[in-house]
From Swiss-Prot:
Region (Complementarity-determining-2): 54-60
Region (Framework-2): 39-53
Name this protein carries in UniProt: Ig kappa chain V-III region PC 6684
Region Framework-1: start-end pairs: 1-23
């Protein structure tokens, strides 16, 4: 199985500043010009919401302050400027092969 390691496990960011979350895969999740990495946001009592698919594509309806980048084994989610409603736990997930594993999550607090 591909192991996804997120860092940091938690972070606190001031309103209006930048939040950066990293995800490292134990082997490449990129092939044929695509990077099969996705980012989700989850708030308590709610299902995960897809933010970014295929490393850098913004899901419809997601604010442009969310952006994703990376390829191969190293990926980043950026949120800028952070808003109060962004307080949540963020997860990376790959779909390069089965099982489609998730990272351990990053809890974002807004100061």
């Amino acid at each position: 199985d591909i192991v996804l390691t997120q860092s940091p496990a938690s972070l606190a960011v001031s309103l209006g500043q930048r939040a950066t979350i990293s995800c490292r895969a134990s082997k490449s999740v990129s092939t044929s010009g695509y990077s099969y990495m996705h980012w989700y946001q989850q708030k308590p009592g709610q299902p995960p919401k897809l933010l970014i698919y295929l490393a850098s594509n913004l899901e419809s309806g997601v604010p442009a302050r969310f952006s994703g980048s990376g390829s191969g084994t190293d990926f980043t989610l950026n949120i800028h400027p952070v808003e109060e409603e962004d307080a949540a736990t963020y997860y990376c997930q790959h779909s390069r092969e089965l099982p489609r594993t998730f990272g351990g999550g990053t809890k974002l607090e807004i100061k």
